[in-house]
Amino acid sequence: MIDYINVIGAGLAGCEAAWQIAKRGIKVKLFEMKPKKFSPAHHMETFAELVCSNSLRSNQLENAVGLLKEEMRLLNSIIMKCADAAQVPAGGALAVDRTKFSQMVTELIKQNENIEVINEEVRELPKEGITIVATGPLTSGDLSKHLADFVGEGYLHFFDAAAPIVTFESIDMNKAFKAARYGRGTDDYINCPMNKEEYEIFWNELVNAELAEVKDFDREVVFEGCMPVETMAKRGKDTLRFGPLKPVGLVDPNTGKEPYAVVQLRQDNSEGTMYNMVGFQTRLKWPEQKRVFRLIPGLENAEFVRYGVMHRNTFINSPVLLDATYCLKKSPNIYFAGQITGVEGYVESASSGMVAGINAAMDFLGKDRVVFPKSTAIGALSHYVSDSSIKNFQPMNVNFGIMESFPLKIRDKRKRNYETAMRALKILKEYVSKYS
């Protein structure tokens, strides 16, 4: 009998899965192809690399992803432990210093005596034992082909985009200003205001800018949560002003008025030396990014630490293939976790790794699997990806809409969400005593 569990991929989901298995006293072989081989979007040698934004989104219980974070904390998540420790200012959101975060996860994984890290590319599934596939949206070519043949349902393809990062010292703070919307919270964001003329010049250059060639990009299939800014701009001249460039609740101290549009920059590291352009995921050519984004007031001399990039995202038809424990229905010794399952977002990916890891451990120990209830965020997400009634499966962030509803006579949405969250945490605490 194999005395360990295989986990393929040391991203957010894979690290969380390995951690959950190891803390239950079971040996893990964690396979990671870095640093021998990198995907088009990965650059760091460390685990759990954040390739898009450095924000894990809201930390508030009134928001579903805030609830999901708290549920994961209850279940002793390594990802939440490291994210909380590597936090940088971001208002009500949980943003992290991506380098410190990745280093912390890597150190904890490597220090765990139950986890053996193997730096090799896996080209096909192991023939024996329990395996968790957490290879992410950029699964390597050979393994992608093997998995496509193995699951028999084929793959769905789309593309994600990452936003540029600029240095703080290159931002003209005589034009830009720090402020929170409506004066709420701390002034964590840098705001670059635009008048109507500046915005229209910027918009025109953006929609006509030259795009980078993307291999196999033969049709525009994008996920709303990570849509390229130029794609959004092409939907209409005012789309950006009602999206990531909305000016509401902000007053330009130089004019005393609300700007026509505002580009926001969010702190990207602990030192505050780097800021990412919020909502500016892009597939423009790099020289075009420099030219067009320097039209933004305050960024005329911006130094780009990282340009935006476009990369492939691959995921399986989970409702057909998986059950609510992320186990492959036709092969109960195989689990999937992370974005390859169609969950969307850093926290969601890690949560799927948590569920897969817990259940792989239960299988290994000969115990019943854990199906988390739809009344919890972590359970609602696992039920969504395994809902066989879904005919046109698309990636999904966690939200209160997929959770089991209760008859709450509360009209205020935030209060209703908060009560839903409190009920979810109460229910989950009953599971913690059993399965943590």
Curated annotation (Swiss-Prot):
It comes from the Bacteria. It catalyses: uridine(54) in tRNA + (6R)-5,10-methylene-5,6,7,8-tetrahydrofolate + NADH + H(+) = 5-methyluridine(54) in tRNA + (6S)-5,6,7,8-tetrahydrofolate + NAD(+); uridine(54) in tRNA + (6R)-5,10-methylene-5,6,7,8-tetrahydrofolate + NADPH + H(+) = 5-methyluridine(54) in tRNA + (6S)-5,6,7,8-tetrahydrofolate + NADP(+). Its main location: cytoplasm. SUPFAM superfamilies: FAD/NAD(P)-binding domain. InterPro entries: FAD/NAD-bd_sf, MnmG-rel, MnmG-rel_CS, MnmG_N, TrmFO. Its cofactor is FAD. GO terms for cellular component: cytosol. Signal peptide: none annotated. It is found in: Cytoplasm. It holds the Pfam family GIDA. GO terms for molecular function: flavin adenine dinucleotide binding; tRNA (uracil(54)-C5)-methyltransferase activity, 5,10-methylenetetrahydrofolate-dependent. PANTHER family: GLUCOSE INHIBITED DIVISION PROTEIN A, METHYLENETETRAHYDROFOLATE--TRNA-(URACIL-5-)-METHYLTRANSFERASE TRMFO. This is Methylenetetrahydrofolate--tRNA-(uracil-5-)-methyltransferase TrmFO. It comes from Acetivibrio thermocellus (strain ATCC 27405 / DSM 1237 / JCM 9322 / NBRC 103400 / NCIMB 10682 / NRRL B-4536 / VPI 7372) (Clostridium thermocellum).
